[in-house]
Amino acid sequence: MPIGSYSSFRDIIRQVLMHNPKTVLDLGIGHGINGAGIRNWLNVGIKENYKQTTLIGVEGFRQYHSPLWDCYDLVEITTIQDYLDNSNAQYDCILMTDVLEHFDKDEGNAIINKIVNTKLAPGGILLVSTPAVWIEQGAAYGNELETHRSLWHFTDFIGMPGVEIIKDGREDDMGYMMLVVKITKV
């Protein structure tokens, strides 16, 4: 879906604010709510402050375009895999919110490893959120990229260097069961 979990949004934005990144890559932006949150809270909603943070979005489905995309300095219309293969940039913060479940486990782990090893700047953070329960979903809105292919558990991340489990998948105060993980490049 072109939207993520409301209950994870507050955790993601909190981590972004605590890290205060100068460069942010948002992978799988959907309608662009993460960009709006970053501009609203990190840049205090003031257009002149936008230059303090470079915000790049990647989205594989052009039809998700919304006015929130204007919060980004640039939105690349391509798959996450192609972007990671063809970009040499490094970022202080990379977001994968409600994206990981769209890859099988092997591909998801390969993407995480590529991000941490080649796309995160030293001391940078990767923030991942994904449902902690299986939700059957096919090609929503005619978008094959929306198909759910995997279920992740916090134990899938244990042992990775720099991992901090922010939300472990247990039901939260809103009734959601989400996993939120921060990986810091050491």
Question: Would you name each region that the model predicts?
Answer:
Residues G123-P131:
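Conserved beta-strand signature within the Rossmann-like core of class I S-adenosyl-L-methionine
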Residues F61-R62, P131-W134:
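Short beta-alpha junction loops
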